[in-house]
Amino acid sequence: MPIPRKELPNVGEYVIATVKEIFDYGAYVTLDEYNGLEAYLPWSEVASRWVRNIRDVIRENQKIVVKVIRVNRRRKTVDVSLKKVPENEKRRKMLWWKRYLKASKIVELVAEKIGKSIEDAYREVVWKLEDYYGDPLLGLEEAVIRGPDALREAGIPEEWIEPLYNEALRHVKVKMVKIRGLMFLRSYESDGVERIKKILLSAKEILDKVGDNVKGRIYLLGSPRYVIEIIAPDYKEAEKVLKEILTTTEKLAKELKVEFRFERERK
């Protein structure tokens, strides 16, 4: 179980809980993010609609998302609500927790390999990635895409960088998107081939300047058709690069009196 950053949650916080015991008047749950801290879920906070049996809504050992509604810091007691958690928040929190656990396990594995304690793993890596990226796994994904500098930016100590980066490459798979299109270039001038080469070179220079998280290539499909292919972490980034390429090449084509046309690949 991950090490908690603080002893008790704050009122209004959404937390992951495991249903421990169910009674006629409510249930006791343990908070996964707080080292199994016990919290009380009153009957009145189980569901917004009337239910005959609390077990129609929850069951023992079930993972649920609850909202903290009361905290007694002196007695270290916590009350939570299930009915005050919106559906979208349930999905968001569950996904975040799943990703947090995966990132934590990767960092703990690296800690064991380099002789660091579990406490060091969280203090020096997991929490720093969380603070910088909002999600430790997102930090590892950025490292896979952009390289070790993504870890350095978050303030990770240098002794962690190489082993953590290598472990991320083994365990973190980043989904990439690809967009393609056909660029038609035709010139009737005597030096038309050279003019087209200049246009293609201008496009290649743009691809060479984009960050490590974007890959692209331009190749001849059969004169006068050239394929433009952009691979990026998301469509927004891919479209941004494609737009820059098309704006630059179309402008240059007009200057060089080269016929220009672009067609998006149909899916």
UniProtKB/Swiss-Prot annotation:
Keywords: Initiation factor, Protein biosynthesis, RNA-binding. InterPro entries: NA-bd_OB-fold (IPR012340), S1_domain (IPR003029), S1_IF2_alpha (IPR044126), TIF2_asu_arc (IPR022964), TIF2_asu_C (IPR024055), TIF2_asu_middle_sf (IPR024054), TIF_2_asu (IPR011488). GO terms for molecular function: ribosome binding; RNA binding; translation initiation factor activity. Residues 12-83 form the S1 motif domain. It comes from the Archaea. It holds the Pfam family EIF_2_alpha. PROSITE patterns: S1. The keyword Cytoplasm does not apply. eIF-2 functions in the early steps of protein synthesis by forming a ternary complex with GTP and initiator tRNA. Heterotrimer composed of an alpha, a beta and a gamma chain. Belongs to the eIF-2-alpha family. This is Translation initiation factor 2 subunit alpha. It comes from Staphylothermus marinus (strain ATCC 43588 / DSM 3639 / JCM 9404 / F1).
